[in-house]
Structures are given as structure tokens and as C-alpha cells.
Amino acid sequence: MAACDRCGRCLQACPYGIVTPVPLAENLVAYGTPTLAFDHGCCDFCMQCVDACPTGALAYGGPRERDLGVAVVVKDACVAWDWAGCTVCKDECPVEGAITLDDHDRPVVHPEYCDGCGKCEQVCPSASLRAYDASVEDKGIVVVSRSSEAAQATGAVSSEELASKRTVAVAQANAASPHTKGVHPDGHDATREAGA
């Protein structure tokens, strides 16, 4: 992101409004740098932000074009960790095999398949289902940067762990990863409904 001059063209180009500037209150150094806010929608990898970038800070390429981060389950916010029945993140995930359920019907994210599109975070109902508990602000599943410590944790993390280990998932289209654009790591291309 060193090439980013914070011109805002990627923000204007995003048809879903998920590319937003890092707020000053969140990070003084990264202030104004493009980041992803999945409360507005999810990314379908249309690459309009990449096309609009005049500096090449966002670029096609790399072994995995579709990689915005990785989803992490927040166990004290995820409804499935307290009650059975919520499978919204798994049901809505457009990448086959990225989210499965464990023996207790709780979501498990498989980082090797997850592309960080944010659909799971967008549709997660935990904040509204837990409105009675003011201590729960987080979604039950959130997208973090692959380089963050939270992404390196195995299984689910707590809200405290997430807050201390979360790194802003800055819009980045050229991160290294084991598989390529729209192709499931096992070889078949059943990963997306749109934009292959």
C-alpha cells in the first residue's frame, strides 16, 4: 500500500460502497488509506477499484487475485457457539468449502479456500440477535488481514483476542496464496456465483 496516494478513486469506483477510507480515530498512520467495510456489502471481485487506481497500489496479479483477507469466527459473538441452528455464514458463503460446520454445528473457516469477500460478515445476524447484550458489538464472523495474528489463530477467537490481534484489512488484490483466481484449491471451479 506504499504506492497509495489516497486519491479516493477506488472509493468512488466501488459499486457496493465497501471500499472506505481508514478513519482518523482508528489509525493515524493509515488515515485515508482504502480499507474494506463489509457492513455496506460484500466484494464480488469486479475489480473496478483496481481499474480506477492510478498508482498501481491495487493491481491484478499474483498467484491468487481474489484475496482480500480471511474470515475469522468470533466465538463469544457467534450465535452458533451458544445456541444451535445458525448457519447463515456457511449457507451464504459463495466459495465452496470455505466455511463448514464442526461436530457441534459451529462454523469453521478454512483459510486455504476463503478469499475474504466479506459475504459472511455482511449476513451475520449475531449483532441483531444479541441486541439484549450490550457487551457484544462484533459480528460472529469478521474478515481480517491474512498477515494479522488473528488470522494465524486456529479455530475461533474471542472478542478480546480479535481486538488485540486484528489488522485493518486494507484493500489488496495481489496477496500470495496457494491457489489462483476463482479456482478451488482442489482444482474445480465451483467457488463463485458471479465474476469468474
Give the positions of each predicted feature.
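Membrane-embedded segments
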Residues: 15, 19, 24, 32, ...
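Flanking helices and flexible, charged tails adjoining ferredoxin-like Fe-S electron-transfer domains
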Residues: 1-3, 23, 30-42, 51-196
